[in-house]
Amino acid sequence: MKFINTLFLALLISSISNNTNAEETYIGDVSMGEVKHSAAFTQMKRMLGEWEGKLYQQSGAVVDTYSKFRLVSNGNSIVETLIEDGVEMFTTYSDKDGKLVIKHYCALGTEPMFTVASMDKNSIQLKSDPRPGYHPEHHNFVKSMGWTFKDENDVRVDATLHLDGELQAQHSMIKRIN
């Protein structure tokens, strides 16, 4: 009898647990369904929240930087608001056909796209997607971006930019504030 009671209790707890995780999102009577995310999207979710720190430019200039990463669209997209030295920019992160797709709306007036170049448990590196058609001799644009996680609250952000035909590197050291 003790075995049957234990088994019943285990099944009851299991069914309650499964029902709690089985919530679906609806808009009106339309189910939004379930989407599986790439490992790269899951890695970027580590950035959710607010961050601030310093941006170190190749020229030697050091400016304030702030980022806010939010999960939107039923958890299927991440939007980043980035403010460098008071100038606001916007970046989106979402999956398409199982791969992370990134689009950056840059203060340079360009909208470069990125794909994953490499990833491990402590970093994700992005490279320029050639589809927007930017050329280093004719356009100013971000060529690469990457995040290296010291821990969940301290991150180094690296980027390279084509500026007036020259490739420049910069990095930020940011801390989670929320």
Over which residues does each language-model region extend?
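Positively charged n-region of N-terminal signal peptides that target proteins for export
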Residues: 1-5
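Bacterial N-terminal signal peptides
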Residues: 7-15
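Boundary at the C-terminal end of the N-terminal hydrophobic targeting segment
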Residues: 20-22
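Edge beta-strand at a domain terminus
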Residues: 24-26, 33, 152-178
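Central antiparallel beta-sheet cores of small beta-barrel/beta-sandwich binding domains
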Residues: 27, 34-37, 53-136
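N-terminal helix-cap/turn-to-beta initiation motif at the start of protein domains
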Residues: 35-50
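Residue-level recognition of beta-strand termini and adjacent short loop/turns
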Residues: 73, 120, 149-153, 178
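Asp-box/WD-like beta-propeller blade repeats and closely related beta-sheet repeat scaffolds
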Residues: 140-144
